[in-house]
Regions:
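Hinge/lid segment of periplasmic solute-binding proteins
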Residues: 90-138, 150-162, 186, 270-272, ...
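Short helix-initiation/N-cap motifs at beta->coil->alpha
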Residues: 65-73, 91, 157, 232-246
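Extracytoplasmic/periplasmic solute-binding protein
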Residues: 130-134, 139, 159-207, 249
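Conserved N-terminal structural module of periplasmic/extracytoplasmic solute-binding proteins
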Residues: 14, 27-95, 109-112, 256, ...
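A structural signal for short loop-to-beta-strand junctions that line the ligand-binding cleft
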Residues: 83-84, 112-145, 171-172, 281-283, ...
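Long, aromatic- and glycine/proline-rich binding clefts that accommodate carbohydrate-like moieties
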Residues: 272, 320-369, 376
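Glycine-centered hinge/linker elements that transmit conformational signals in sensory
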Residues: 162, 204-234
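Extracytoplasmic/periplasmic substrate-recognition and gating elements
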Residues: 51-56, 129, 220, 224, ...
Length: 398
């Protein structure tokens, strides 16, 4: 990365501000940066961006990827500790903004213009911007081209394909079905929703749609696929990834972060839209991965300089992308460079079919309530209707 990216005046101002913050309870020492990101993202590439920043500016940058990063961030930031920068999808942002764990940002015009406006909107909450968008994420159907010539358009086609492949000792599909993020597309296909909207168009947490007739159709499909042996009981992400890598399963539902391992395994794979449910398109959550500045940080201006003038530049994004694919970059110029890649195109297609994850604090109740519901559905402890009704009641505090 070019050292010219650092502007001496801005950097001097950053250090002045960092010293000013030193008296307050902070995450790290002034003039140093600690960055947290999830373990399935390109943390080694992000560290390279940090190393380039250190070389250019003399500011040490450490990148970590703790387990249960959101939980640890909440605890640490509430205690005046933790990272200076936290990179995470936008859906938890409203909760952290409301709790005072992150600070609003005011990006310059060029920074804002370089990034898709829809990505910025994901980080808007109560009239302010709370994070810098890095990439737009949407899961899709990843298929092994050696086993699937044409990806199925519907789940009816998936079930037919499973019969054909079962005769050869293979299975058609597997995904981390107890994880709401991966199963939501089939619940949303028929009209399932997390929250309704109020008269102003804002999310209304008193209007819950996880037990709507459309969501129930998707849940019944999931229960049936396990009951009828199309997918095994008790499978998770590791089982899915292992079976796909061994060629035992022809398709999986996952995101761009999975591509790198598939390339290393020399699997010729493609990405397609998630199959339809009962004639309705599956609608994945669209997440915008972004970087937020923690309220306790003593180095807020240094953090801003690092994000705006290093990480979000095409050179910085390329470092992260080379480690683990970003999927669809929010940066317009970098997306243009990658747009010829059919897997990037398919990811954008899935994003266009999907819906942004709500970013209000009540999303925490959604994730916990739906996790229990899916476990109960797939283990046969509750019928799909009982499980979804219970999830809706928990979300409403009943």
């Amino acid at each position: 990365m070019s050292t010219q990216a650092i502007r001496p005046i801005a950097l001097a101002a950053a250090f002045t501000a960092a010293i000013a913050f030193a008296g307050a309870a902070g995450a790290q020492e002034a003039g140093k940066l600690l960055v947290w990101i999830n373990g399935d993202k390109g943390y080694n590439g992000l560290q390279k961006v940090g190393d380039a920043f250190t070389k250019a500016a003399g500011v040490p940058v450490t990148v970590e990827h703790p387990e249960d990063a959101p939980g640890k961030f909440q605890q640490a930031a509430a205690a005046g500790k933790g990272p200076d920068i936290f990179c995470w999808p936008h859906d938890r942002m409203g909760e952290w903004a409301k709790s005072g764990l992150i600070v609003p940002i005011n990006p310059g015009k060029k920074v804002r213009d370089d990034i898709e406006e829809t990505a910025w909107k994901a980080f808007n909450y109560q009239g302010k911007t709370w994070g810098y968008p890095v990439s737009v994420e949407a899961i899709g159907l990843i298929y092994n081209k050696a086993l699937v010539k044409t990806p199925p358009k519907s789940f009816d086609d998936v079930i037919k394909l499973d019969k054909e492949l079962s005769a050869k000792g293979k299975k058609a599909i597997l995904w981390d079905y107890n994880n709401t993020y991966f199963t939501w597309p089939i619940l949303a296909a028929g009209g399932g929703s997390v929250f309704g909207r109020d008269a102003k168009g804002e999310y209304d947490p008193t209007k819950v749609g996880v037990n709507s007739p459309g969501a129930l159709k998707g849940a019944e499909l999931l229960a049936g696929m396990i009951k009828n042996g199309q997918m095994p009981k008790g499978s998770g992400y590791a089982e899915m990834e292992g079976a796909f890598n061994k060629g035992e399963v022809a398709m999986m539902i996952s995101g761009p972060w999975a591509w790198d391992n598939l390339k290393k395994s020399n699997i010729d794979f493609g990405v397609a839209p998630i199959p339809d449910v009962a004639g309705q398109p599956s609608r994945p959550f669209v997440g915008v991965l972004g970087c937020m500045i923690a309220a306790p940080s003593k180095s807020k201006d240094v953090a801003k300089e690092f994000i705006e003038n290093h990480l979000l530049k095409v050179e910085g994004l390329k470092m992260v992308n080379a480690d683990v694919p970003l999927g669809t970059p929010a940066n317009k110029a970098f997306f243009k460079e990658l747009a010829e890649n059919p897997n990037i195109k398919a990811t954008m297609e899935n994003a266009k079919r999907g819906e942004p994850m709500p970013n209000i604090p009540e999303m925490g109740k959604f994730w916990s309530s739906m996790a229990s519901a899916l476990e109960n559905i797939t283990n046969g402890r509750q019928s799909p209707k009982e499980a979804l009704d219970a999830a809706a009641a928990r979300m409403l505090g009943k």
